């Protein structure tokens, strides 16, 4: 291995350790992470959903289930995850003011607070990576 490979290996090991300790094996992680880390689709959905919310976009049911490519989950699975997140009080569901049949989704205050704690911890602990 040459010098560049040693640097790459060092960075790769730091990244892997950071992901394992901060994302997967961290006992301080909020409860919502257990739900959203259960499979690839849920984690992808969480990140996409939070991105859209933080960008200020209104998130309808159809928009929410379209955030993640279809190859990760069927339409039924996508709807089930959204509805389960609502039942678990991670995401709130309200009727649109314009069209009462249309449902609008937002993260709950608890999810927002826990998500920001989670991202702050990862950011602080990964600055050295």
Where are these predicted regions, by residue range?
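An acidic intrinsically disordered interaction segment
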Residues: 1-19
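Short amphipathic alpha-helical interaction segments
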Residues: 71-87
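A short, conserved structural fragment
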Residues: 86-96
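Short acidic, hydrophobic short linear motifs in intrinsically disordered regions
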Residues: 55-68
């Amino acid at each position: 291995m040459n010098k560049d490979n040693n640097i790459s290996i060092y960075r790769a090991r730091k990244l892997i350790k950071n992901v394992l300790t901060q994302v997967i094996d961290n006992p301080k992680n909020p409860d919502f992470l257990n739900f959203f880390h259960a499979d690839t689709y849920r984690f992808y959905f969480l990140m996409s959903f939070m991105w859209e919310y933080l960008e200020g976009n209104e998130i309808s049911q159809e928009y929410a289930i379209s955030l993640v490519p279809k190859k990760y989950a069927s339409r039924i699975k996508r709807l089930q995850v959204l509805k389960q997140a609502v039942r678990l009080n991670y995401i709130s569901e309200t009727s649109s003011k314009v069209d009462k049949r249309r449902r609008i989704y937002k993260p709950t205050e608890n999810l927002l607070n826990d998500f920001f704690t989670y991202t702050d911890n990862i950011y602080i602990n990964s600055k050295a990576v």
